[in-house]
Regions:
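Short, contiguous hydrophobic alpha-helices characteristic of membrane insertion segments
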Residues: 9-31
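N-terminal leader/signal peptides at the extreme start of proteins
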Residues: 1-10
């Protein structure tokens, strides 16, 4: 004789356990996605800035004229900064358009940028605090040989993004380096 098996299917307990596990995994992935998304915003801002600075350096070499760059921390913008009293002193701003991070990088409203001159300091060992709103500006000059008159450290910060991003322009060579921040400064061993 055969035993009556009833209808085949899953029990309510099995379904509840499965739904609970799927919910937990989905919750964990959403948290991870948000952190990765913010880290990608910082990576994009650093990449755009590095490319813009490199092009400004090339313009100084091509035109055989120093290019002064103005860095506006509050607006997250970079622009060529000619001398209005002596237009021949620096590159005119008509040679290269400004870089405005908020317009270039999508969803970058929470990014904070800070900068500081490097006075014979190693950017890998220079700590730069970057929290809260920033104001003021910095400047940088690329010479006709592509060198920089002063070094500068630029840092991009976004809350809960993990590691911040930093860019260093090394004086006197004008070398532009990009990396992630560490507890003691910047790590330039891997750019991204």
């Amino acid at each position: 004789m055969r035993a009556d098996r009833g209808k085949a299917g899953y029990t309510l307990v099995e379904l509840m356990v499965t739904v609970s596990l799927v919910g937990i995994l989905a919750g964990l992935s959403i948290v991870s996605f948000g952190r990765n998304w913010r880290a990608e915003r910082l990576k994009a801002a650093a990449g755009e800035t590095t490319a813009w600075l490199d092009e400004a350096r090339r313009i100084a070499i091509q035109k055989a004229k120093p290019c002064r760059i103005s860095i506006n921390r509050a607006e997250l913008s970079f622009s060529l900064d000619p001398n209005p009293d002596n237009p021949e002193e620096f590159c005119p701003d008509s040679l290269y358009g400004p870089l405005e991070i908020r317009n270039t990088v999508q969803n970058s409203g929470a990014i904070v940028m800070c900068s500081s001159e490097l006075e014979n300091g190693d950017p890998a060992q220079t700590s730069l605090s970057c929290s809260g709103s920033q104001s003021g500006s910095s400047s940088l000059i690329f010479t006709p040989r592509g060198t920089a008159t002063t070094g500068i450290l630029i840092k991009f910060h976004m809350p809960e993004a993990g590691a911040d991003r930093c860019i260093a322009v090394m004086a006197p060579l004008g070398q532009i380096r990009s990396g992630k921040t560490t507890a003691t400064g910047c790590d330039f061993t891997t750019a991204y």
